[in-house]
Amino acid sequence: MSPARINVAACIDSSGSLPIELPVLSDAAGRELLNASPKMTESDDPVALPIIMRPTEPSCVCSVVLLLPRMRGPVIRISMGVPDWL
């Protein structure tokens, strides 16, 4: 087993919060998000995995990840702002 990094991309509203409803992305915004996915994995870490997530899914994703045994559980770091891959 080796460490892996998972990059999660989600849409946020103008205040920086996850919106309650799924926003409708324009075609241009959807293409930009898909084009940014390969940039998320361009790093020294060869096992990075980009995930594009709906705003309603964070609790589902976090609950599954946090139930992993400690030896297998990931280190989760949450940050806000513009990621370095943009």
Swiss-Prot record:
Superkingdom of origin organism: Viruses
Protein name: Uncharacterized protein US2
